[in-house]
């Protein structure tokens, strides 16, 4: 059997996303709006398969073929007859549920490959003897031949997502390395093109020069587009001795489906902001224009407090090894009014709370742009995983001048809260009951502060294309050096493009630190309804949760390459290091032996020292993070952040040794089953599924009732068209592939 790092266990937690009550409260028009936006999101989410690994689209197509012909219970009878044990068949169901849940065969949280936990020969017998194989023998055999080896392979390079020799990525062709990514970013910056909706393909030309294709995601390919700002950029360039060609049409047939449903949703929009937003999204996905997506995002920001909230596009850059290309995601959710009222009170206090942050006023935005902050119950979240909170859009220029929205996903948090006492690793016994009682409320506080005042705070110092600065060069002083500002962002540079590989994690660390820092403020806790000893317990559990998460984070570190695979977990490890460095017994991590005789560890947080030792340490660290971010000082920023993120076996903690203990006792993240919406006449029905691997599989089998086989064919054709770029990793699909 495979190393447990690379399998999903049979007893993995599976939870259903509960949004029945929120959906019931929608009007018929709101339901139709939500339905078409959900359809757009689910179709677009299929692009993530093409953004993850060369084999992911084939695995998805194969699984979908199998379970459309026989549901999990029917296939079980066949599998047992073929000689599988109940455990082996359950392992296959869990694997399939994992592929659907992550939109690929790499975990969305940690970027680690997972493989089926049963012998390959047995799975082959099930697949080739299945009803799907009887109905379409050539197609099913062909799919299996294309992805079977890669489905199980744990060759070192294939174990993680990464660039070049570090791992697998389909954002770049297989022969690209970090130098190519940097060169491409310089090229994109020179043309004022965003990387968010691009992929990079490299070939060696006849004269030995490298040829790079920058391919934009769009419905249109070579067709001329009238009045598009992109048309003039779709051409060949010579740049630093290399040939670049800007093309478009990536994921075209998938985005065509997205556009069709966005157009349908427009008919049920609640106001002109929503109509204009959707029109710009249609333009963006049709043309491949990030500028159009920015315009849509501007209308989205202006659409305050809608009943049905949504966002869609190439958004988060966590999984691009370089950190600037966005993964497709789309969500649709309904407002939870009770929790939203608390967040609105937090927004009302935000200007006052921003003044509490440990940097000078010049490092804060000139004007606080009052954002929306709502608690939402998710109906649909398509992509590779579901976060607990979001602060979007990610476009720096919009965030600085137009503002943003904060979203806390209430029914996702409810799934995360559900913690069994026996699963609480690395904690003192006396902390466990307190933790179970206060984890939910403390997480609400942390998510609120993290999104609104973490991601929502701070200013970037920018010199625009005309040479004008957005800060006073004469009077603004760097509090770390006592000197005038020496560095800033030039026109075309963004946080992601400048800080690239550390940008996501550094920013998550800043936001998490703001949450820890401001949760000490009594005014914040009163907003959420906590005073006296309850408030102190919320603070303690919030800080304890963070330092424990810092230890759990070691699961997401790869010693062989010295790489972190998950931005949030790297951030939490960095915070643990900062608080350990503060000393005075504030935090200790002690190796122990568990009651089972195996290695264990205990995290201890001295609650009496949170304010006296923890707060000043966090204050110093936060100020440094913000100053280096504001000034775009990537050299010092990288040195600071990578210094704290280094994992060594230096005493007293011996983190590399502790990592083995963390892996020994790790808990897999839950899989989440989402409902479907179904249009029956002019009414939209909510279709729910049981919280099990089989339920998750059924939800996906019923997700594309009209065009499932067509979509699978589209996905495999798109994957096959680009298979040559990963020839050393993937065998090209045989002809006749469906």
From Swiss-Prot:
Keywords: Acetylation, Aminopeptidase, Cytoplasm, Hydrolase, Metal-binding, Metalloprotease, Protease, Zinc
Listed GO CC annotations: cytoplasm
UniProt-annotated location(s): Cytoplasm
Cofactors (names): Zn(2+)
Outcome following mutation: residue 451 to A/D: Loss of activity
Top-level taxon of origin: Eukaryota
Binding of Zn(2+), residues: 450, 455, 508
Coiled-coil intervals, chain numbering: none
Gene3D superfamilies: 3.30.540.30
Pfam families: Peptidase_M49
Regulation: Inhibited by spinorphin, an opioid peptide derived from hemoglobin.
GO biological process, one term: proteolysis
Record's cofactor remark: Binds 1 zinc ion per subunit.
Main subcellular location of this protein, as a coarse class: cytoplasm
Similarity comment: Belongs to the peptidase M49 family.
Name of the molecule in the record: Dipeptidyl peptidase 3
Organism: Rattus norvegicus (Rat)
Taxonomic classification: Eukaryota, Metazoa, Chordata, Craniata, Vertebrata
């Amino acid at each position: 059997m495979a190393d447990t790092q690379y399998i999903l266990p049979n007893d993995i937690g599976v939870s259903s996303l509960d949004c029945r009550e929120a959906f019931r409260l929608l009007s018929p028009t709101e339901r139709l709006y939500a339905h078409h936006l959900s359809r757009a999101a689910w179709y677009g989410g299929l692009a993530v398969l093409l953004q993850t690994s060369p084999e992911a689209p084939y695995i998805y197509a194969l699984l979908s073929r199998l379970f459309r012909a026989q549901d999990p219970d029917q296939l079980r009878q066949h599998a047992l007859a073929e000689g599988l044990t109940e455990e082996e068949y359950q392992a296959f169901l869990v694997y399939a549920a994992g592929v659907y849940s992550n939109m690929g065969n790499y975990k969305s949280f940690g970027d680690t490959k997972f493989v089926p936990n049963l012998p390959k020969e047995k799975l082959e017998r099930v697949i080739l003897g299945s009803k799907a194989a009887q109905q379409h023998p050539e197609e099913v055999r062909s799919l299996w031949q294309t992805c079977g080896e890669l489905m199980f392979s744990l060759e070192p390079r294939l174990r993680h997502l990464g660039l070049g020799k570090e791992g697998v990525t389909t954002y770049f062709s297989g022969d690209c390395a970090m130098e190519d990514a940097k060169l491409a970013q310089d090229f994109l910056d020179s043309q004022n093109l965003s990387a968010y909706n691009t992929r990079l393909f490299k070939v060696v030309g006849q004269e030995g020069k490298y040829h790079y294709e920058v391919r934009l995601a769009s419905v249109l390919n070579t067709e001329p587009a009238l009045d598009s700002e992109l048309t003039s950029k779709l051409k060949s360039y010579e740049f630093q001795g290399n040939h670049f060609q800007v093309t478009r049409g990536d994921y075209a047939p998938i985005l065509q489906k997205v556009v069709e449903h966005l157009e349908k949703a427009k008919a049920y929009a609640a106001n002109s902001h929503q109509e204009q937003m959707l029109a710009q999204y249609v333009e963006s996905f049709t043309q491949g224009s990030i500028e159009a997506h920015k315009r849509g995002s501007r209308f989205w920001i202006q659409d305050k407090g809608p009943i049905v909230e949504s966002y869609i596009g190439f958004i988060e850059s966590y999984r691009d090894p370089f950190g600037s290309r966005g993964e497709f995601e789309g969500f649709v959710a309904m407002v939870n009014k009770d929790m939203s009222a608390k967040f609105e009170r937090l927004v009302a206090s935000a200007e006052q709370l921003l003044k509490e942050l440990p940097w000078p006023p010049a490092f804060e935005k000139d004007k606080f742009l009052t954002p929306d902050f709502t608690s939402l119950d998710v109906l649909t979240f398509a992509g590779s995983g579901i976060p607990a909170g979001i602060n979007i859009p990610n476009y720096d220029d919009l965030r600085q001048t137009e503002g943003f929205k904060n979203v806390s996903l209430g029914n996702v948090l409810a799934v995360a809260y559900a913690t069994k006492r026996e699963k609480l690793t690395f904690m003192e016994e006396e902390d466990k009951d307190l933790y179970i009682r206060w984890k939910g409320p403390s997480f609400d506080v942390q998510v609120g502060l993290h999104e609104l005042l973490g991601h929502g705070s701070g200013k970037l110092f920018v010199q625009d294309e005309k040479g004008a600065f957005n800060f006073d060069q004469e009077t603004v002083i760097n509090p770390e050096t006592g000197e005038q500002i020496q560095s800033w962002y030039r026109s075309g540079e963004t946080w992601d493009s400048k800080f690239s590989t550390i940008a996501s994690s550094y920013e998550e660390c800043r936001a998490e630190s703001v949450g820890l820092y401001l949760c000490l403020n009594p005014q914040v806790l009163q907003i959420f309804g906590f005073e006296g000893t309850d408030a102190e317990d919320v603070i303690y559990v919030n800080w304890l949760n963070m330092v424990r998460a810092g230890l759990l984070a070691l699961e997401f570190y790869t010693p062989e390459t010295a790489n972190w695979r998950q931005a949030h977990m790297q951030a939490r490890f960095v915070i643990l290091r900062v608080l350990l460095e503060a000393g005075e017994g504030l935090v200790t991590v002690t190796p122990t032996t568990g009651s089972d005789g195996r290695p264990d560890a205990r995290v201890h947080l001295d609650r009496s020292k949170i304010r006296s030792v923890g707060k000043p340490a966090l204050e110093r660290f936060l100020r440094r993070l913000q100053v280096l971010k504001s000034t775009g000082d990537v050299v010092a920023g990288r040195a600071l952040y990578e210094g704290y993120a280094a994992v060594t076996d230096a005493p007293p903690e011996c983190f590399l040794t502790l990592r083995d203990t963390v892996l020994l006792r790790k808990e897999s993240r839950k899989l989440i089953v989402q409902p479907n919406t179904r249009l029956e006449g002019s009414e939209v029905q909510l279709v729910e599924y049981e919280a099990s691997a089989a339920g998750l599989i059924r939800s996906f089998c019923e997700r594309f009732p009209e065009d499932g086989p067509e979509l699978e064919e589209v996905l495999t054709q798109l994957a096959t068209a680009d298979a040559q770029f990963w020839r050393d990793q993937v065998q090209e699909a045989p002809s006749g592939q469906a």
